[in-house]
């Protein structure tokens, strides 16, 4: 009978409710852990692998020599390359260089396979698209990413050069 009386008093006094409110009040006055994503961003690690980038040489010439090693090594088969046979006789160039970002698993094997460091992983990964076809990055988009993130990519590659 004594145990039943304790349970009745606990349920009438709503002990669990007051315990929960105490926990809530305790956490209410602590600093926030949550990051408000679009406005605030967490810093990425130096070796973060984001959206792909095609690089150019300092003179503006494309680095890619259309060897297709990145296409061959990609485990997800996310890279598609066509060789441009009509443009120059002394150097092979790509006519089509497409990457399906939804297929890609961001493993970095394409970056490791490239003999001229033409394709590297960029410093950002924002994949909020309104159109499903936006997941396909074409050659001009990849080159534009390379130009806009050039300083960050060069700094990362120089810092990581001793491990390559």
Swiss-Prot record:
Listed under GO biological process in this entry are:
aerobic respiration
Q: Pfam families, from UniProt?
A: Fer4_7 (PF12838)
Q: Topology with regard to the membrane?
A: Peripheral membrane protein
Which cofactors are named for this entry?
[4Fe-4S] cluster
Q: Which residues form the 4Fe-4S ferredoxin-type domain?
A: 55-84, 95-124
The record lists [4Fe-4S] cluster 1 as bound by 64, 67, 70, 114
What is the reaction catalyzed? a quinone + NADH + 5 H(+)(in) = a quinol + NAD(+) + 4 H(+)(out)
Record's keyword terms, sorted: 4Fe-4S, Cell inner membrane, Cell membrane, Iron, Iron-sulfur, Membrane, Metal-binding, NAD, Quinone, Repeat, Translocase, Ubiquinone
InterPro entries in the record: 4Fe4S_Fe-S-bd, 4Fe4S_Fe_S_CS, NADH_quinone_OxRdtase_chainI
List the record's Gene Ontology CC terms alphabetically: plasma membrane
Q: How is the cofactor bound?
A: Binds 2 [4Fe-4S] clusters per subunit.
Give the molecular function GO annotations: 4 iron, 4 sulfur cluster binding; iron ion binding; NADH:ubiquinone reductase (non-electrogenic) activity; quinone binding
Key word DNA-binding present in the record?
no
Where's it found, cell-wise? Cell inner membrane
- Enzyme Commission code(s) on record: 7.1.1.-
What is annotated about its quaternary structure and interactions?
NDH-1 is composed of 14 different subunits. Subunits NuoA, H, J, K, L, M, N constitute the membrane sector of the complex.
- Primary role: NDH-1 shuttles electrons from NADH, via FMN and iron-sulfur (Fe-S) centers, to quinones in the respiratory chain. The immediate electron acceptor for the enzyme in this species is believed to be ubiquinone. Couples the redox reaction to proton translocation (for every two electrons transferred, four hydrogen ions are translocated across the cytoplasmic membrane), and thus conserves the redox energy in a proton gradient.
Q: Which NCBIfam families match?
A: NuoI (TIGR01971), PRK05888.1-4 (NF004538), PRK05888.1-5 (NF004539)
Similarity comment text for this entry:
Belongs to the complex I 23 kDa subunit family.
State what protein this is by name. Answer: NADH-quinone oxidoreductase subunit I
- What is the species of this protein? Magnetococcus marinus (strain ATCC BAA-1437 / JCM 17883 / MC-1)
Query: What are the top taxonomic ranks of the organism?
Result: Bacteria, Pseudomonadati, Pseudomonadota, Alphaproteobacteria, Magnetococcales
């Amino acid at each position: 009978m004594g145990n039943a009386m304790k349970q009745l008093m606990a349920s009438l006094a709503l002990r669990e409710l007051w315990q929960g409110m105490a926990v809530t009040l305790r956490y209410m006055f602590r600093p926030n852990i949550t990051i408000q994503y679009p406005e605030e961003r967490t810093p990425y690690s130096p070796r973060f692998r984001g959206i792909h980038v095609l690089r150019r040489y300092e003179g503006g010439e494309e680095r890619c020599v259309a060897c297709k090693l990145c296409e061959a090594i990609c485990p997800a088969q996310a890279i598609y390359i066509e060789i441009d046979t009509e443009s120059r006789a002394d150097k092979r160039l790509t006519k089509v260089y497409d990457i399906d970002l939804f297929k890609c698993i961001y493993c970095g094997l394409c970056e490791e396979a490239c003999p001229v460091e033409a394709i590297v992983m960029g410093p950002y990964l924002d994949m909020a698209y309104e159109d499903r076809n936006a997941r396909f990055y074409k050659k001009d988009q990849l080159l534009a990413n390379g130009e806009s993130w050039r300083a960050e990519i060069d700094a990362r590659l120089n810092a990581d050069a001793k491990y390559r």
